[in-house]
């Protein structure tokens, strides 16, 4: 199969470490109070899978569900890399218009990508409504500059998250991202060593 094929096998078998499971199942859900907290991992083609979940007892499990790459457009993925924690308090909010719509000095649209109060895509809002979700929290898991996955929390009524908790979530996501990189780098090294031994 060669080194590349073996590396792909190694990547598929890399687990989410025990410390990350704790972050999802205890720290994040207990800390934030959301009804459901999930971890998505993206494959090389951008498709996602939920492989860790903590939820209220009355909710149906989503663990193991797969989602097509089209559920998260490329533009949204780029924004997740720039602004790594996003909170939506109430999906039924009324957006406030930006006045003026264009920058007076350049005539260009204002870059709102780093703004926490930036409105969300109408398509995404409808997607959440279709699932019955009212409030969300999303934190990016980034490895070596690419979007590895997401920590996503759903609530079925409006939920506000104060700034201090957002910062804690950001820190926990960064810790998880560092751990993910360490686990995958170790797995890749082990696969490379195994292939080297087989080729000798």
Regions found by a protein language model. Give the residues of each.
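Signal-transducing coiled-coil/dimerization helices and immediately adjacent hinge/linker segments
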Residues: 14-33, 182-200
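Short, glycine/acidic-rich hinge or "gate" loops at secondary-structure transitions
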Residues: 40-46, 145, 185-195
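Signal-transducing coupling segments at domain and membrane junctions
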Residues: 94-134
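Regulatory loop-to-helix N-cap segments in sensory/regulatory domains
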Residues: 115-120, 148, 154-170, 180-186
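GAF sensory/regulatory domain recognition
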Residues: 40-102, 197
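Short hydrophobic/glycine-rich mini-motifs in sensory/regulatory modules
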Residues: 1, 47, 141-151
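Short regulatory alpha-helical segment in sensory/regulatory domains of signaling proteins that mediates
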Residues: 24-33, 38-43, 52-55, 128-129
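Short hydrophobic beta-strand micro-motif common in sensory/regulatory domains
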Residues: 134-142
């Amino acid at each position: 199969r060669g080194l590349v094929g073996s590396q792909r096998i190694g990547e598929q078998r890399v687990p989410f470490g025990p410390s990350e499971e704790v972050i999802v199942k205890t720290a994040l859900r207990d800390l934030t109070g959301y009804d459901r907290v999930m971890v998505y991992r993206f494959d090389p083609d951008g498709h996602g899978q939920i492989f860790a979940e903590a939820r209220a007892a009355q909710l149906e499990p989503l663990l193991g569900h797969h989602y097509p790459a089209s559920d998260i457009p490329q533009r949204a993925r780029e924004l997740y890399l720039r602004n790594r924690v996003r909170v939506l308090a109430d999906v039924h909010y009324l957006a406030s218009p930006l006045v003026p719509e264009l920058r007076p000095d350049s005539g260009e649209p204002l870059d709102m990508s780093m703004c926490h109060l930036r409105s969300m895509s109408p398509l995404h809002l409808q997607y959440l409504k279709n699932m019955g979700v009212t409030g969300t929290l999303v934190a990016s898991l980034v490895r070596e500059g690419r979007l590895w996955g997401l920590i996503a929390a759903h609530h079925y009524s409006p939920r506000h998250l104060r700034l201090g908790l957002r910062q804690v979530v950001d820190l926990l996501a960064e810790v998880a991202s560092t751990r993910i990189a360490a686990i995958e780098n170790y797995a890749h090294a082990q696969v490379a060593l195994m292939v080297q031994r087989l080729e000798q």
